[in-house]
C-alpha cells in the first residue's frame, strides 16, 4: 500500500490530470480529507469488475472500499429499504436504472458533485446538475453460435429473427425479468407493433430467466441464437474463446445508461467525492473496456467487437413512459408468449 507523496502522485497520474498546479492541489486536498475518513462504501451492480476497480482505488489512495456487489435490482432494493428505515449506509452507488437515479435526484436524495472530468462525457452521459454520470453503457444485441449458424444465415436485423428457420432455435427473456429486455421490447413495439411478438411467439422461443442462461445455451449449442442479450456478456464469452458472435441489429440498438451517484448525507463524504472522481477517470474507463464494457467517457475506445454508439443506431427509451407502463408491457409480452 502506498501512502503520502507516492500515493498522491500515483492517484494524480491515475486520474489522467492535466498536470496543472490547481488540479494537483484540489486532488491533494480531497485525498487528505478522504484518508482521515479511511473508508468509502460502494453499492455496485458492476458484477465481475467491481473488485478490480475497488482494488485499484485502494492501491492508489490507501482508502478502503467496502463493497456491496449485486444485481441492479438488489442494489436498488437495498438502498430503498435503508432509506425507508431512515438510514444512509452507502456513499457511492452504481446500477443500471437511470430512472431510479433520476427519481432519487428529484427527491433530493443525491448529492450534487463537481466533476473534474466533466468535459470527457457527452451531454446525455452526465447530469447537468452534477447528480450522476454514466460509468458505462449497456447495448443490446443478438448473440449466435458461430459453429451452428452459417455466415449467410446470421440474423442482421431484429426482423430476421422472425424467419421460420429459427423455429425453437431462439433463447429470449421477458421484460418482467430485466431492464435490457424492457428497452428492446419497447423499441420493437414502437417499430413493428405487438404483431412482431405474436410472430415471434409462433416460433416457440426458449424463455430464459437471465442473460447468463441465454449465453450459456448459445455456447453449449442448445440453441444457436439469443435475442435481446446484453452485448458485453456475449463479448466476454468470445474473449474466452467461446464460439459466440454478436450482431447489433440495423433497426436500432437499445442502450441502457448505467449511472454513478453519491447519496446525500453519505457517511464518508470526502472519500465519496474522491471515489466519484476516480470512477470518472480514463483509467477506470479503460479498465471497464478491457472487461468488455462500454465506458461512458467519450475518449475511451470501446471493447473489441463493440462499435461506438455513433456507429450504431442507438435507441434510448422514454424512462418516464417505462416507469408508468413497464408492468403492463411485461404482462402483455408474457401473455403473448404463453399462448
Model-derived features with residue positions:
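A ligand-binding cleft/hinge motif common to bilobed small-molecule-binding domains
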Residues: 98-103, 224-243, 292
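Short beta-strand->loop
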Residues: 110-117, 130-133, 159, 236-254, ...
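Extracytoplasmic ligand-binding site segments that recognize negatively charged/polar headgroups
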Residues: 43-54, 66-222
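A bilobed periplasmic-binding-protein/Venus flytrap-type ligand-binding module shared by bacterial periplasmic
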Residues: 141-148, 185-186, 256-268, 287-288
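Periplasmic-binding protein-like
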Residues: 138, 166-177, 198-201, 207-208, 240-266, 279-302, ...
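Extracellular/periplasmic bilobal clamshell ligand-binding domains
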Residues: 304-339
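Immediate post-signal peptide segment of exported/extracytoplasmic ligand-binding proteins
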Residues: 23-41, 58-59, 163-168
